[in-house]
Amino acid sequence: MQPLRPSPAAGGWAGVAGVGPTTVDEASMERSKSFVKALQELKNLRPQLYSASEYCEKSYLHSEQKQMVLENLKDYAVRAVVNAVDHLGTVAYKLTDLFEQQASEVSTVELKVARLNQQILTCQIFTDRAGLRQQKIGGTTFKHHKHYILPSTGHKRTQAARLQTDNGQDSKPKPYPSAKTLSWHLSSENSISTTGAQKYTFTLGDTISSKPASNGSMYLLGKDIPASPMHKPLQPNGNTSFDAKKNVGSKDQPGFMHMSTFNALDKPRGREIQKVPVSTKSMLATLFIKHKSAKTRKASVR
């Protein structure tokens, strides 16, 4: 139930249950009607006051008790003024109520408009950001040249993420062999340089060397080639000598000659610098005899 409230226009009680307004439009309509009614009552005071003044004037002229007529006129004038002020207050109250109602409606509409503007602005900002993000996917345009731009942390993170993804893809088995890198080629060249000395083939005249034996000796195909004068320019003393050791436990085959090592080709006497042999046993290490063995052989000859 709605609480009872006095009506300043009618001076009675209104708003009884079932009589009051049910919607906002009906309430505003009733307020407008009450304001118009109060304004009309204020306008009706003018003819009433004119008729009261004429009556007082006639009664004062034709009556013998003029003093009594004056007192009644004073009381009527006071009541008329009070009634006029009351009507003015009612009209002012109705006007203020109507103005407040209109102001509240205007403020509500402004609030709704502001909310719609905020929603539109939010949608526009989101659309701009989404559009910029999509445009940046195609390619970023730098303000300065690339040489003068320091790499940002975000760029480093993206590079690190790409490297991680590449490593993850490389870790998976591939159906086809991967391309050889520069480090692989360098390591293969080094391995060939260290082990390639054991795979040399020598051609002496019509002879072709075969694969080296397990103990470092070399088998030469063909006839025995004696020392010829063509080898003398290679020797500083003019002597060419080959010391061949027989391979222990191996059988002599026809057409093959066992040669384990070559002598130092009569190196010149004097102090020589001995190079440190390579860690891996190669054919060059088996071809040359250490200088110490040459000294012991010379001592035995003496």
Curated annotation (Swiss-Prot):
Residues 161-170 have a biased composition (Polar residues). InterPro entries: ABI. Keywords: Cytoplasm, Cytoskeleton. Coiled coil: none annotated. The keyword Flavoprotein does not apply. It is found in: Cytoplasm, Cytoskeleton. Binds SCAR. Belongs to the ABI family. This is Probable protein ABIL4. The lineage of its organism: Eukaryota, Viridiplantae, Streptophyta, Embryophyta, Tracheophyta.
